[in-house]
């Protein structure tokens, strides 16, 4: 775990991380345990526990979660099946994404995620519209 992320976790007394495959990208997501608990509570608050489909959604969402501990040297062991899910073979890259950390195969981040022109246009659209949902 890179030092800047470790410092933030230590400052917030986070000792465990929740690991999950990203829903949309070929990467893994590390949540500080408190952030994961908040996100899980939000999801559960939107689900009806008496609706079988909602129970399937919750089950699917939490089924691939792994709890990781960070050792004294800032290391954590990511299980092999997660590395395979994210196509990670050698070098990895950590990307801070607001209140969570994405873990990528470095070779997947060597190119921009979006073409610069597409990115600038999309960002302009998001930042200049009253409803930022498209």
What are the language-model segments listed below?
Residues 3-27:
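A positional/architectural concept
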Residues 13-19, 55, 87-88, 92:
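Charge-rich (acidic/polar
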Residues 21-28, 33-36, 100-109:
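Short, basic amphipathic alpha-helical segments that act as recognition/interaction helices
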Residues 66-75, 80-89:
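Beta-rich strand-turn-strand
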Residues 84-106, 112-113:
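Short conserved catalytic/interaction loops centered on acidic-Pro-aromatic/His motifs
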Residues 106-134:
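Short, Lys/Arg-rich amphipathic alpha-helical interaction segments
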